[in-house]
């Protein structure tokens, strides 16, 4: 086994000992320590192209951009193969898969044994968060995938900067990854919160293989956050600047396919001249209490790992600008001359394409050319609307926390929580409706507390209790809101136009956070009332707005029954104050129905 010239660029005995131990287990032909330099990026990219792992795109149209086909069986996160390996099953809770830690190390160790024979082991040091921030966490990912090493170089602050931050400390996340034989039968993503360790084998896909992202920044970090008194959340962070120059910051949690990246990169409508929205982060937020008693947030990531289909100049022009250079596209469609395409792009499909499986594709085919979960990995600095505070080690002060799911009925356009506990209740019961394709039953609500269901690194009830406990730590807490852009008419049409027009709802929330907007009290929370939203220049009927904001008592009685089933699933660790919130709301709804 050889080690590359950038050999062992650290004297940290804890790190060196662990890398040697993992090399002994995986048996690579050579070890390469990543330094994060541009020269290294070029060298690794050339290696990946030579190995046909990456395909260069037309460098005139897409400078510095490359294409990657994944194995067709390896195209998404695999929740059923993702495990939380706490000492007891109760610590993982009823919403996570659990594996006993010793058994997990034994089972995965047998797959890792010799898995890197004939391959290079890349040692990828990285920092999540601005490198000088008190928020920052160091991780080391060992991987046999050059694709993963290059993606980590985009998604995190990678290389020497991480080793400098680490020094001789033993406090780093130990991440071991191997594609191995990419066999779904031998695919496991295991998290060991007590050991600050992640082992992932059998997948090269982003969320399973880029261990800094969901694995460390959410699953492991949520456990660390509980113990250390902060929050690690599946939230975008955006900066809103008013025409007068006032800047406010919000964090927002939406489950997948609910427009998180679009909201983070929103362009306000023409009716809002002078307003600017800038992106601090599009996916993950780490929040701590500042010296001023407010909640301060950083984006631990350094890039965007976005879903390509549906992204276009209308829905998200800033995302389209972000992917113009130095981006890796995974499982989209491409043309033989080095262009790319996906469903929902601005122009129609070319007559002929190479689809995401590498097969010829003709216009009119019933098969999708790009995989529905095809992705782009783009540097955050490419975003023309990035916030200048994105690298600020202090983070940004959060005025409002927003929760939102995809509900075609029941949930109104916007609600403000009565208080922190009520806000945690709204977040704990949020969710999205399944489609017929997913379950055979349309409209079944999949609860997704704080959009964190697949990402909580310990028991869900204890996680919700941690949210409640945070109230006593935050003297000046942000206001909490619930939004729903997706309510439909009886004919199945969206009632609210969404996209840039979500600025109208955001403005009301910002004004409420600043204490300068009126609100109407309802049994569900505070709403804008008839005149609270700025609707000038909006081509939507009054009836549609009324339907989008309506509170239907019959629907809410059903909703609360469904919430009871969800709370029952959480078991004995469900915080009593949340059960009480549901009971009080049920009483209010029933009393209001009797009055009617």
Curated annotation (Swiss-Prot):
Specify which residues bind GTP according to the UniProt entry for this protein: 257-262, 375, 406, 499-502
Residues engaged in binding substrate: 77, 205-207, 256, 373-375
Name the pathway.
Carbohydrate biosynthesis; gluconeogenesis
Any single Pfam family the record assigns to this protein: PEPCK_GTP
EC numbers listed for it are: 4.1.1.32
Any one cellular component term from GO for this entry?
cytosol
The answer to whether the entry has keyword tRNA-binding is no
Q: Which residues bind Mn(2+)?
A: 214, 234, 283
Which keywords has UniProt assigned to this entry? Answer: Cytoplasm, Decarboxylase, Gluconeogenesis, GTP-binding, Lyase, Manganese, Metal-binding, Nucleotide-binding
Please list the reactions this protein catalyses. Answer: oxaloacetate + GTP = phosphoenolpyruvate + GDP + CO2
**Names of the cofactor(s):** Mn(2+)
**Active-site annotation:** 258
A GO MF annotation of the entry reads: phosphoenolpyruvate carboxykinase (GTP) activity
Q: Which GO terms describe its biological process?
A: cellular response to glucose stimulus; gluconeogenesis; glycerol biosynthetic process from pyruvate; oxaloacetate metabolic process; propionate catabolic process; response to lipid; response to starvation
Instruction: Using the UniProt annotation, give all residue ranges assigned to the region (Disordered).
Output: 362-388
Q: How is the cofactor bound?
A: Binds 1 Mn(2+) ion per subunit.
What subcellular compartments does it reside in?
A: Cytoplasm
UniProt subunit comment:
Monomer.
Sorted alphabetically, which PANTHER family does this protein's record hold? PHOSPHOENOLPYRUVATE CARBOXYKINASE, PHOSPHOENOLPYRUVATE CARBOXYKINASE [GTP]-RELATED
Q: Which family does it belong to?
A: Belongs to the phosphoenolpyruvate carboxykinase [GTP] family.
What is the documented function of this protein? Catalyzes the conversion of oxaloacetate (OAA) to phosphoenolpyruvate (PEP), the rate-limiting step in the metabolic pathway that produces glucose from lactate and other precursors derived from the citric acid cycle.
Q: What is this protein called?
A: Phosphoenolpyruvate carboxykinase [GTP]
Give the source species: Anaeromyxobacter dehalogenans (strain 2CP-C)
User: Taxonomic classification, please?
Assistant: Bacteria, Pseudomonadati, Myxococcota, Myxococcia, Myxococcales
């Amino acid at each position: 086994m050889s080690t590359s010239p950038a050999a062992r660029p650290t004297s940290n005995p804890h790190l060196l000992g662990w890398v040697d131990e993992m090399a002994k287990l995986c048996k690579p032909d050579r070890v390469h320590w990543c330094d994060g330099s541009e020269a290294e990026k070029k060298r690794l990219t050339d290696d990946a192209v030579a190995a046909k792992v990456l395909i260069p795109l037309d460098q005139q149209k897409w400078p510095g951009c490359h294409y990657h086909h994944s194995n067709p069986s390896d195209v998404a996160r695999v929740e059923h193969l993702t495990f939380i390996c706490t000492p007891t099953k109760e610590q993982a809770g009823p919403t996570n898969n659990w594996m006993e830690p010793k058994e997990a190390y034994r089972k995965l160790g047998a797959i890792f044994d010799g898995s890197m024979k004939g391959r290079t082991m890349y040692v990828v040091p990285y920092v999540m968060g601005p490198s000088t921030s008190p928020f920052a966490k160091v991780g080391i990912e060992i991987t046999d995938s050059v694709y993963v090493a290059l993606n980590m170089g985009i998604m995190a602050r990678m290389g020497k900067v991480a080793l400098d931050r680490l020094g001789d400390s033993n406090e780093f996340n130990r991440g071991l990854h191997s594609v191995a034989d990419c066999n779904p039968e031998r695919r496991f993503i295991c998290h060991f919160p007590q050991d600050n360790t992640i082992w992932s084998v059998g997948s090269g896909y982003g969320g399973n293989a880029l261990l800094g992202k969901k694995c460390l920044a959410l699953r492991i970090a949520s456990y660390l956050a509980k113990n250390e008194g902060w929050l690690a959340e599946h939230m975008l962070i955006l900066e809103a600047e008013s025409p007068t120059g006032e800047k406010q910051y919000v964090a927002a949690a939406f489950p997948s396919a609910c427009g998180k990246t679009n909201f983070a990169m929103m362009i306000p409508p023409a009716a809002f001249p002078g307003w600017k929205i800038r992106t601090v982060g599009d996916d993950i937020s780490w929040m701590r209490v500042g010296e001023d008693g407010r909640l301060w947030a950083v984006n631990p990531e350094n890039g965007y790992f976005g879903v390509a289909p549906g992204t276009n100049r209308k829905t998200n022009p800033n995302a389209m600008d972000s992917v113009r250079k130095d981006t890796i596209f995974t499982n989209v469609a491409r043309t033989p001359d080095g262009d790319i395409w996906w469903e929902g792009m601005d122009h129609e499909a070319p007559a002929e394409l190479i689809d995401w499986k590498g097969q010829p594709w003709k216009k009119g085919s019933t098969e999708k050319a790009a995989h529905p979960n095809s992705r782009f990995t783009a540097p955050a600095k490419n975003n023309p609307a990035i916030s200048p505070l994105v690298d600020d080690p202090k983070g940004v002060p959060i005025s409002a926390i927003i929760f939102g799911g995809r509900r075609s009925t029941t949930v109104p356009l916007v609600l403000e929580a009565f208080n922190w506990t009520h806000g945690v209740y709204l977040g704990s019961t949020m969710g999205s409706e399944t489609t017929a394709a997913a379950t055979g039953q349309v409209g079944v609500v999949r609860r997704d507390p704080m959009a964190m269901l697949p990402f909580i690194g310990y028991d869900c009830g204890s996680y919700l209790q941690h949210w409640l406990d945070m109230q006593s730590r935050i003297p000046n807490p942000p206001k909490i809101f619930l939004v729903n852009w997706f309510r439909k008419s009886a004919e199945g049409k969206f009632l609210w136009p969404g996209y840039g027009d979500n600025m109208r709802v955001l403005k009301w929330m910002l004004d409420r956070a600043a204490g300068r907007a009126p609100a109407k009290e309802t049994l569900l929370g505070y709403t804008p009332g008839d005149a609270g939203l700025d609707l000038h220049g909006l081509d939507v009927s009054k009836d549609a707005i009324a339907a989008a904001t309506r509170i239907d008592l019959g629907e809410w009685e059903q909703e609360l029954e469904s919430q009871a089933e969800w709370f029952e699933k959480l078991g004995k660790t469900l915080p009593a104050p949340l059960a009480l919130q549901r009971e009080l709301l049920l009483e209010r709804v029933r009393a209001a129905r009797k009055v009617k």
